[in-house]
């Protein structure tokens, strides 16, 4: 009888050990699913190419009409807003060309009855000289113009003085005089019509025409 109690006690100890062994093991935590990648952006390359091409067409038209400043600004817009397009790839060279033509053909203006070079005109002529040093085969005709006040003969002479003043300034910057030709038109070719101070101011000028060389 004592042996049976001992056997029961032996069985009871493991059962108590199992019952008191602590909390059950926690279930493994399932990892959260990885976030899905966003869908790729729609392919708008054709639209970007078309938009850039339209701006380039406007730039080409501006170049053809001699509005080099507008052409340059349009090409810079393409380079800024539509990088990677065919038009943007070609833009840097065309911008350089437009900038050179803009400098070479920029006109200068004079005060009433004067042929002296103002500070503003000097800055324009200095940029012109830089372009001429880069494009060594370019030659220019310098035209002198006047407003309508004064006699025809007087304005012819004043126009020539203005053209020669521009020539003298350019040669003082080290450019060869053989690259230039001077001519006067007096009051015969006004830039602006009308007998107002604004029109007269625009007409007192020297124009620069490219007569040889490629840009």
Model-derived regions, located:
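Bacterial N-terminal signal peptides that target proteins for export
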Residues: 1-10
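Periplasmic peptidoglycan-binding/tethering modules of Gram-negative envelope proteins
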Residues: 25-139, 212-215
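Periplasmic OmpA-like peptidoglycan-binding domain that tethers envelope proteins to the cell wall
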Residues: 143-215
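Residue-level signal for mature regions of secreted extracellular proteins and peptides
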Residues: 13-14, 49
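Short, conserved catalytic or interaction motifs in soluble domains
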Residues: 22
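A generic local structural motif
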Residues: 2, 126-127, 194
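C-terminal motif of bacterial Sec signal peptides marking the signal peptidase cleavage site
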Residues: 16-19
